[in-house]
Amino acid sequence: MYQLKKLYNEELKAKLSEELGIKNPMLLPKLEKIVISVGAGDHAKDTKVMQNIADTISLIAGQKAVITIAKKSVAGFKMREGMPMGVKVTLRGNQMYNFLEKLISIALPRVKDFRGVPRNGFDGRGNYSFGLNEQLMFPEVVYDDIMVSHGMNITMVTTTNNDKEAFKMLELFGMPFAKGRVNG
């Protein structure tokens, strides 16, 4: 089931070592975790909608999502301390590779007019973030079960501090990047 993890351990480590010129296998870039988050925005006040968003993200990730809560009150955002603000889930290990495989091979190809994920999502420290406009591209999501169409932010945290190494690793995993060049 975890074909990407097997692929990384059996083939990609050797390719990365050769292409990046890293001889020590412990210094090779690895995927540490994937964080999926949703900002609820105007829907934060409705507990049923928040629970529906959490359930949807839990289905997509295969792991229970957590509703995030505001730590401070900010009048400009009409936000009070303790108010629900969004949903997040952190994936590690086999769940992480399972989600990445589903994202690359099933979800992203189902996006209409998809031209690749943007290359400018790297943060300068080897982590990659991008956003999706809706959740309907995932096979677990049933249209009739969702109350609100929402997007999500996906952040991939790697062990490297270099964007080019992280890009090379994600590219070898099969991440469909758009044409252009990488930051850094």
UniProtKB/Swiss-Prot annotation:
PROSITE patterns: RIBOSOMAL_L5 (PS00358). GO terms for molecular function: rRNA binding; structural constituent of ribosome; tRNA binding. Keywords: Ribonucleoprotein, Ribosomal protein, RNA-binding, rRNA-binding, tRNA-binding. GO terms for cellular component: ribonucleoprotein complex; ribosome. Transmembrane segments: none annotated. GO terms for biological process: translation. Belongs to the universal ribosomal protein uL5 family. This is one of the proteins that bind and probably mediate the attachment of the 5S RNA into the large ribosomal subunit, where it forms part of the central protuberance. In the 70S ribosome it contacts protein S13 of the 30S subunit (bridge B1b), connecting the 2 subunits; this bridge is implicated in subunit movement. Contacts the P site tRNA; the 5S rRNA and some of its associated proteins might help stabilize positioning of ribosome-bound tRNAs. HAMAP family: Ribosomal_uL5_B. Part of the 50S ribosomal subunit; part of the 5S rRNA/L5/L18/L25 subcomplex. Contacts the 5S rRNA and the P site tRNA. Forms a bridge to the 30S subunit in the 70S ribosome. This is Large ribosomal subunit protein uL5. It comes from Wolinella succinogenes (strain ATCC 29543 / DSM 1740 / CCUG 13145 / JCM 31913 / LMG 7466 / NCTC 11488 / FDC 602W).
